[in-house]
């Protein structure tokens, strides 16, 4: 048990979006060691098919299993929407997604709920289903925002065009007089300064990163897996260019992370993917 307690928590996303979850882990679980993986060679996930996402997630989880993680947080709403329920039973460590914690937080704040997310997450209706399962009276409006992740990954957050895009995506939600807005993609917290210029202060902003980490903390405590000594330095790995990831991420981490490039194992049975494609799509 001692060795498992010392194992890292795995966190993955398509890119820098999951750093919002990582920073929250630093805040709520400062004594835990972390392993962060960004699938930058294949981002953005939001325009991928369900079968592609499932394949990518399985490859990442197999690799993380090889790194002896004790828990994995899918710091990616698209993965959480399209793959979490399928892969949870395939691995012997807990896997947490961001959608259910975000939905629970949203229904505590209001009943007219807007969700901004990737197109794939919006198409899945994962947030609407989760929110209305908790509160059937809640009204939910979803907008798939195809341009946000590429703009963030290109470090164009302060580009005037990004604000124009934000107006385009948020206007339909504001027209519905929403009282709550959910960041349905972990990348979007990086755009908070822009959103706060557009969204009235009466609208509650929900960042699921805060709540999935709280859930992870509770689960570690229940399983007796909390680490109570100083952690190892966070390990960063990517499937794409390490230097690009490090350069972009340092503005949110406060330091230039040493990042390694890794090759993920191919683990997919093509016939199984075809079968699950019918389920996911």
From Swiss-Prot:
Which sites bind substrate? 13-14, 45-46, 77-78, 186-187
Q: Which reaction does it catalyse?
A: L-glutamate = D-glutamate
Matching InterPro entries, A to Z?
A: Asp/Glu/hydantoin_racemase, Asp/Glu_race, Asp/Glu_racemase_AS_1, Asp/Glu_racemase_AS_2, Glu_race
What lineage does UniProt assign to this protein's organism? Answer: Bacteria, Bacillati, Cyanobacteriota, Cyanophyceae, Oscillatoriophycideae
Per the record, the similarity remark reads: Belongs to the aspartate/glutamate racemases family.
Pathway field: Cell wall biogenesis; peptidoglycan biosynthesis
Query: Per UniProt, what is one Pfam family of this protein?
Result: Asp_Glu_race
- TM helices/strands, residue ranges: none
GO annotation terms (biological process): cell wall organization; peptidoglycan biosynthetic process; regulation of cell shape
Read off the HAMAP family from this record: Glu_racemase (MF_00258)
Q: Which superkingdom heads the taxonomic lineage of this protein's source?
A: Bacteria
Its recorded name reads: Glutamate racemase
- Gene for this protein? murI
Q: What is its EC number?
A: 5.1.1.3
What keywords appear on the UniProt entry? Cell shape, Cell wall biogenesis/degradation, Isomerase, Peptidoglycan synthesis
């Amino acid at each position: 048990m001692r060795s498992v307690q010392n194992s890292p928590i795995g966190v993955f996303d398509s890119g820098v979006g999951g750093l919002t979850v990582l920073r929250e882990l630093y805040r709520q679980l400062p004594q835990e060691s972390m392993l962060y993986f960004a699938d930058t060679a294949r981002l953005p996930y939001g325009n991928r098919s369900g079968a592609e996402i499932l394949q990518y997630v399985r490859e990442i989880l197999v690799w993380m299993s090889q790194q002896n993680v004790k828990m994995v947080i899918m710091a990616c709403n698209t993965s959480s929407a399209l793959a979490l329920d399928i892969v949870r039973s395939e691995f012997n460590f807990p896997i947490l997604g961001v959608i259910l914690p975000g939905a629970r937080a949203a229904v505590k704040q209001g009943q007219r709920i807007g969700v901004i997310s990737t197109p794939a997450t919006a198409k899945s209706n994962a947030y609407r289903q989760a929110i209305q399962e908790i509160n059937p009276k809640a009204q939910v409006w979803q907008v798939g925002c195809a341009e946000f992740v590429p703009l963030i990954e290109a470090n164009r957050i302060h580009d005037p065009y990004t604000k124009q895009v934000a107006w385009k995506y948020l206007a339909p939600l504001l027209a519905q007089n929403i009282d709550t807005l959910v960041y349905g993609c972990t990348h979007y917290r990086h755009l908070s300064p822009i959103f706060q210029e557009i969204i009235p202060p009466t609208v509650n902003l929900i960042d699921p990163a805060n709540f999935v980490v709280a859930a992870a903390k509770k689960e570690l405590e229940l399983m007796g897996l909390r680490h109570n000594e100083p952690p190892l330095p966070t390990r960063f790995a990517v499937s794409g260019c390490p230097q690009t990831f490090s350069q972009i991420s340092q503005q949110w981490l406060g330091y230039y992370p040493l990042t390694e490039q890794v090759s993920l194992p191919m683990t997919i049975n093509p016939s199984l993917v075809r079968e699950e494609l019918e389920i996911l799509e």
